[in-house]
Every structure is written in structure tokens, then in C-alpha cells.
Swiss-Prot record:
An annotated GO BP: metaphase chromosome alignment
Principal place of residence: nucleus
Domain of life: Eukaryota
Modified residue annotations for Phosphoserine: S31, S249
Designated gene of the protein: CENPQ
Name this protein carries in UniProt: Centromere protein Q
Biological role stated in the UniProt entry: Component of the CENPA-CAD (nucleosome distal) complex, a complex recruited to centromeres which is involved in assembly of kinetochore proteins, mitotic progression and chromosome segregation. May be involved in incorporation of newly synthesized CENPA into centromeres via its interaction with the CENPA-NAC complex. Plays an important role in chromosome congression and in the recruitment of CENP-O complex (which comprises CENPO, CENPP, CENPQ and CENPU), CENPE and PLK1 to the kinetochores.
Pfam families xrefs: CENP-Q
Subcellular location: Nucleus; Chromosome, Centromere
Length: 268
């Protein structure tokens, strides 16, 4: 008893002389306590999970199988167990890749469940039909992957066709808008031309030309014929000669010729 007291006293004096070592020992003790608490908490959590699983298991419907049928059951093959292990590890990596709290504890629980399941699979026996199904899991998975890849390629081709159709539709929409703009410009030009024609001809609602009114001075002014006749001394003789000339056969022939010429010009 005195030896233990001397040893503890010696350790106390060493820690007193070396405070850094004392601090390191305290950190080691704290880390050990933390590890013990974590392990204890994990064990309690696993017990809770196990009890919860048993509670759920009691609610499941149990199926009785004849002993003679169990004789044909076979243990899982190593390839099937390796495949299950690979699949579970892939799921674990996917879960742990996310940013989640208490990742170490979750990883510990998941690894524990994985190892427990793999241990059960080593001694597990299944019917031959189930064995074939588990053996064909890899083949079925490859078939589903190939089908998914084919679907993705089909969707990619469909997306390319949709993009082309959208591009063609946008081009046609642009052409239609351009034609609408041209039609609008032409319509405005036609309206301007119609207004210009109306202004030139000055057509009123009755269809009669709206000519400017003549002044009273213009109406009262002598005609050009009267002015010319006023310059001729012998007006009656001149009018008589013009009447004879107008009624002569040569003048009539000339008038007929001119009329025929106008008719031919109009016909052509």
C-alpha cells in the first residue's frame, strides 16, 4: 500500500515539475473519456436499433416452411456476397459524401450493419429459385443500364430534333415578321399614293372634278375667235370661204381618214 502511495506521489511531483506533460496527460485522459462515451452511446444506440428491429419483426407475418424443403436450400455464393458487399459500399460512399452532422458516428453504425449483414449472408441459405435470382442480379443490372443508356441516347436524339424544330420555327417566325413589316410599309405607301391621287384630281363625293372657279373678268373677256375676227377687215367673206372649205369633199375625206386612223389606234 505504501508502494502505491509513493508511486502516486512520485508521479505528482513529476507532473508538478513538468506542467506540459501534465497538460498532455489531461488531454489523453479527456480523449479516452470521449472515446468511451462515444462507444457506450453507440452500443446503446445499437441496442435500441436491435430492440426496435425485434419489435418490428414480431409484427411480421411468419411463414412456416416444411423441413424437407429446407434440405434443398443452398448458401449464398461468394460472387453474390461480393456483389452485395460492393453494392452496400457504394451506397455508403454515396451517403457519406454529403455534408452531414456526426459523420463518424453514422459511418460507424453503417459499417457495423454492413459487417453484421455480411456475416449473416455467410451462413444464410436460400431456395434454389431465389439463388438464381440473386445470381442474375448483376446481369439484370447490366441490362437495365444498357436500356437506360439507350433511352438516354434516344432522348438526346429527340432533344436534337426538338432544337432543330425550334430553330426552324424561330427562323420562320422571323421571316413572317419581316413580311408583315414589308406589307405594312407597302400598305402605307399605297395609302400615301391614294392621297396623292386624290389631291391631284381633287375628286369630290359626286365624282365631278373640283376645278377652280373662273373669275368674272375672265367670263366677260372676248374669246380668241372674236379677237382674231376683229383684226380681219372683211370678216363675212372669210367666214363664207371657211364654210365652203369645211363642206368640201376634200375636207370630208380628210376628216374620214383621221377618224379611221383614230379607230385603228384605239383598237391596237
Amino acid at each position: 500500500m505504501s508502494g502505491k502511495a509513493n508511486a502516486s506521489k512520485k508521479n505528482f511531483e513529476q507532473l508538478k515539475r513538468n506542467p506540459k506533460r501534465k497538460k498532455d496527460n489531461e488531454e489523453v485522459v479527456l480523449s479516452e473519456k470521449k472515446v468511451r462515451n462515444t462507444v457506450k452511446r453507440n452500443k446503446n444506440h445499437l441496442k435500441d436499433l436491435f430492440s426496435e428491429g425485434q419489435t418490428k419483426h414480431t409484427n411480421l407475418k411468419q411463414i412456416k416452411i416444411a423441413p424437407n424443403k429446407r434440405k434443398t436450400w443452398q448458401p449464398l455464393s461468394k460472387s453474390t456476397r461480393d456483389y452485395l458487399q460492393t453494392m452496400m459500399e457504394s451506397v455508403l460512399r454515396t451517403i457519406l459524401s454529403d455534408r452531414i452532422k456526426d459523420k463518424e458516428e453514422i459511418q460507424y453504425h453503417l459499417n457495423f450493419l454492413k459487417n453484421r449483414l455480411l456475416q449473416l449472408c455467410e451462413t444464410l441459405k436460400v431456395p434454389p429459385k431465389k439463388m438464381e435470382d440473386l445470381t442474375n442480379v448483376s446481369r439484370l443490372l447490366n441490362m437495365e443500364r444498357a436500356r437506360g443508356k439507350a433511352n438516354e441516347e434516344g432522348l438526346a436524339l429527340l432533344q436534337e430534333e426538338i432544337d432543330k424544330m425550334v430553330e426552324t420555327t424561330e427562323l420562320m417566325t422571323g421571316n413572317i415578321q419581316s413580311l408583315k413589316n414589308k406589307i405594312q410599309i407597302l400598305a402605307s405607301e399605297v395609302e400615301e399614293e391614294e392621297e396623292r391621287v386624290k389631291q391631284i384630281h381633287q375628286i369630290n363625293t359626286s365624282g365631278v372634278l373640283s376645278l377652280p372657279e373662273l373669275s368674272q373678268k375672265t367670263l366677260k373677256a372676248p374669246t380668241l375667235q372674236k379677237e382674231i375676227l376683229a383684226l380681219i377687215p372683211n370678216q363675212n367673206a372669210l367666214l363664207k370661204d371657211l364654210d365652203i372649205l369645211h363642206n368640201s369633199s376634200h375636207m370630208k375625206s380628210m376628216s374620214t381618214f383621221i377618224e379611221e386612223a383614230y379607230k385603228k389606234l384605239n383598237a391596237s
